[in-house]
Amino acid sequence: MLTNPRKKIRPGELNLKEKLVHINRTAKVVKGGKRFGFNAIVVVGDGEGHVGYGLGKANEVQDAIAKGIEDAKKNVIEVPIIKGTIPHQIFAKFGAAKVLMKPATPGTGLIAGGAVRAVLEMAGVKDVLTKSLGSSNPHNVVKATVHGLQEVSDAYDVSERRGKSLQDIYEG
């Protein structure tokens, strides 16, 4: 039987790229006027099945982005990608954000917008159909997408759950 491909991920061993999804400016009203702060949501990935997201908050934009990248590297997950797409359809929710992802044939491309596209690009998914429903808040859409990708199960996971070998799963 095969060994479990999903093992503990060490971000230092991966060649991670970063992608900034959204920057938000916040204001706190104080006696002397307004004090501005920033938060940034960042997605990191190696384009080969590893992706993570992070939120950074600071008084300066660059500091918020740096904190977001640091946080994202702590939350990297592994996603099974088969022939450039996901193994099966996924529907995920986080808050009011809902994301539907469907596998697609090679050559279809990455049909996704905004935050969903950023996450799937960083994960290395080449062909997928997506639809974002409900809230379009980038924070919740990113979280819904990543939670959906965490729920993806490949043939190995299915065989382990059913207590059968991979050969039995493929032969029916």
From Swiss-Prot:
Pfam families in the cross-refs: Ribosomal_S5, Ribosomal_S5_C
Keywords: Ribonucleoprotein, Ribosomal protein, RNA-binding, rRNA-binding
Domain annotation S5 DRBM: ranges: 16-79
Record remark: domains: The N-terminal domain interacts with the head of the 30S subunit; the C-terminal domain interacts with the body and contacts protein S4. The interaction surface between S4 and S5 is involved in control of translational fidelity.
Alphabetical list of NCBIfam families matching this protein: rpsE_bact (TIGR01021)
Family from the record: Belongs to the universal ribosomal protein uS5 family.
Role: With S4 and S12 plays an important role in translational accuracy. Located at the back of the 30S subunit body where it stabilizes the conformation of the head with respect to the body.
Full protein name: Small ribosomal subunit protein uS5
Protein species of origin: Chloroherpeton thalassium (strain ATCC 35110 / GB-78)
Lineage: Bacteria, Pseudomonadati, Chlorobiota, Chlorobiia, Chlorobiales
